[in-house]
Regions:
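Beta-lactam-recognizing serine transpeptidase/beta-lactamase-like catalytic domain environment
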Residues: 2-50, 55-228
């Protein structure tokens, strides 16, 4: 996606099918266990994994004005109330600030950050990034889910902070969030068709870039870009 305009430049879903023979293939397509007709880019709902650490970082920045002073010593894992979260490959990252934690994709540090966040504020930030909400899309899509409230356990928060737990998102939605960060916090309305021509080759309709919504401040976006 071109962040400054909203143009969708590429979209892929596997397994695929041949649209030229869809009539002949319809029976097996509709019974295919691999769901070839499902556009996984927009309709797939997956745990976001470490990409969600951007959301956790944003919430921490909003709650703690001194976020640049964050410090954590990673020993490859963190244990809290019986729940242990390991870093990938059991790697110990040592002393980290917030930028280091994101660069290292440190699960221990982000689990620690998750425990420091206000749950309702965390949910509000996620919803400002269009979780639990409609997405700008002309294609069928799955609504992303963020399930955190005052009753969410610390164990669940630790998992949520690193992109696991009950959180679900489509690749398309994660692209929208990333594009907004790249575009200074502003999400442009995505579109697939640049323009439409009639049989003479005359342009009868042209899509132009249009702001959809501001998801974060330009300062927040700039800091996330710096950390990325």
């Amino acid at each position: 996606m071109e962040a400054s305009t909203g143009k969708i430049l590429a979209m892929v879903s596997k397994p695929t099918f041949d649209p030229n023979t869809i009539s002949e293939d319809w029976e097996w397509l509709t019974t295919d266990e691999n769901s070839s007709l499902l556009n996984r880019a927009t309709q797939g709902a997956y745990a976001p994994g470490s990409t969600f650490k951007l959301v956790t970082t944003l919430e921490y920045m909003r709650e703690y004005s001194d976020f640049e002073n964050y410090s954590y010593y990673c020993e490859s894992e963190i244990t809290h109330e019986g729940t242990t979260i390991h870093c990938a490959g059991n790697r110990a990252h040592g002393e980290e600030n917030l930028a280091d934690s994101l660069a290292n994709s440190c699960n221990a540090s982000y689990s620690n950050i998750g425990l420091m966040l206000d749950k309702e504020a965390y949910r509000k930030t996620a919803e400002e990034l269009l979780f639990n909400k409609k997405l700008p899309s002309v294609l069928p899509y799955s609504q992303s889910k963020f399930r955190v409230d005052k009753n969410t356990t610390d164990s669940e928060i630790m998992m949520t902070a690193i992109g696991q737990g009950k959180t679900q998102i489509s690749p398309y939605h994660m692209t929208l969030i990333s594009a907004a960060i790249a575009n200074g916090g502003t999400l442009m309305k995505p579109y697939l068709v640049d323009h439409t021509e009639n049989y003479t080759g005359t342009t009868v309709k042209k899509n132009v870039p249009e702001i959809y919504e501001t998801l974060m401040t330009s300062e927040e976006a700039a800091k996330l870009k710096e950390y990325m």
